Amino acid sequence: MIPLEHPILLESFAHIDRSVGPHNLSSQEYAIARRVIHSTADFDFLHLLRFAPDLPQAEFDPDLPEHQAIARGIESLRHGQTIVVDVNMVKQGIQGLVQRTFNNPIQTAIDFATIADPGKTRTETGMDRCIAQFPEAIYVIGNAPTALLTLCQAIAAGKAKPALVIGVPVGFIGVLEAKKALSLLPCPQIRVEGNKGGSPVAAGIVNALLMLAWREG
């Protein structure tokens, strides 16, 4: 197995572990949170990440991750599922590790729209087109709340059934509304509560899932 983690990264993880100390996250949840903390130097994410929906107790399997979101993410990455991201910064943050692991195709929504449709942003327009072509992809939104709202509306209308939604846009306009819309959907999802988020957070979550999938593969 090719080495995927640089010694400096592992040293940073050890520093984070010492700073965090005891916590209530599962090992897989913590692996994701730690990667996000490493990407942002912000320990608040330990408490802001949400993984949903939980598996029903009747379906509990001790050999599966606790959360359907993590399980679906790992399974989908292993099977080469397309990853749709909202902006190029997210793509740049994940493509190196994607190429060294499962080589999933990466599509960027904003590249699907050189001109925005009337009344929409370019990212929103591009997201519409990605949904039509890749309704079951892994969707990763790190920047544009309008893109996340567009995706949520498509899911609610039955036009999209993503393998996983990573919804972590950042900012003050439309962000809380978009995250709330995602939280009300039954689809597998990883999101960040509040105004924090961003492309480094989105990329960190994907990279953590890639490492979990690679190690357990």
Swiss-Prot record:
The scientific name of the source species is: Synechocystis sp. (strain ATCC 27184 / PCC 6803 / Kazusa)
Q: What is its EC number?
A: 5.4.99.60
Cross-referenced SUPFAM superfamilies, in alphabetical order?
Precorrin-8X methylmutase CbiC/CobH (SSF63965)
UniProt-listed GO biological process terms: cobalamin biosynthetic process
Under catalytic activity, the entry for this protein gives:
Co-precorrin-8X = cob(II)yrinate
Would you tell me the protein name for this molecule?
Cobalt-precorrin-8 methylmutase
| Keywords of the record | Cobalamin biosynthesis, Isomerase
Q: How does it assemble?
A: Homodimer.
A molecular-function term among this protein's GO annotations: cobalt-precorrin-8 methylmutase activity
For this protein, the record's Pfam families field holds:
CbiC (PF02570)
Record pathway: Cofactor biosynthesis; adenosylcobalamin biosynthesis; cob(II)yrinate a,c-diamide from sirohydrochlorin (anaerobic route): step 9/10
Briefly state the protein's biological role: Catalyzes the conversion of cobalt-precorrin-8 to cobyrinate.
Q: Where along this sequence does the record place binding of substrate?
A: S12, R35
Q: Which family does it belong to?
A: Belongs to the CobH/CbiC family.
Q: Which domain of life is it from?
A: Bacteria
What residues form the catalytic site here?
H38 (proton donor/acceptor)
Principal EC category: isomerase
